[in-house]
């Protein structure tokens, strides 16, 4: 039973990828379609924009969720459970809904624009820019990372921190030398997932990316509007390779970090 199950699982995951790779190499450009991703300005710009946006979202998410996760795990206060429920609420929303919420906040008739207009500094609108995408991606990324960090923070040994303090280490030194190394595997793993999710996010980008191009939207355009199936497949494979490599590298680094810490 094990071998058939593995075979079916491998076929389920690998055959679509193999088919996608073949389609990407059989269009008008042939295998050169993969090279065109980095030599054609519009594709390269979309790729770089997506990578930069994903890196920025990941870095910001790790800082915010890292601090919030440790704080929420170590402190009990009135309303904590309600706050946790509210923080995890974005997990229930599809990307299109999150994009709509960003528009309600920072769109042409959004709350932020109305407030800035009342203050006499003009109507601030950024929902349809890279800043709007950043806000939307950050909104759905933070809950995922907070839950992971809280689980890791629960396993922190307070005795190690007390020992460091007794040796004269200040608060920042304790964070740098004790807390961060202990949380490193969780930070690396959750950061990689955050990056991969941001790279492939479509619903939020579809709602907000009217004036900017990110890779999922370019793939959608090539596939549906231009009927350029081969180029859409090549772009999809490149996107998949980048995210797969990131996740594989994070597993290796997180494993090595955990082994060193242990």
Placement of each model-derived feature along the sequence:
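Short coil/turn motifs that cap or connect alpha-helices
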Residues: 78, 169-171
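Glycine-rich helix-loop "coupling/hinge" segments at transmembrane-helix boundaries
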Residues: 26-27, 104, 201-227
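Short glycine/proline-centered loop/turn elements that form peptide/ligand docking sites
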Residues: 156-160
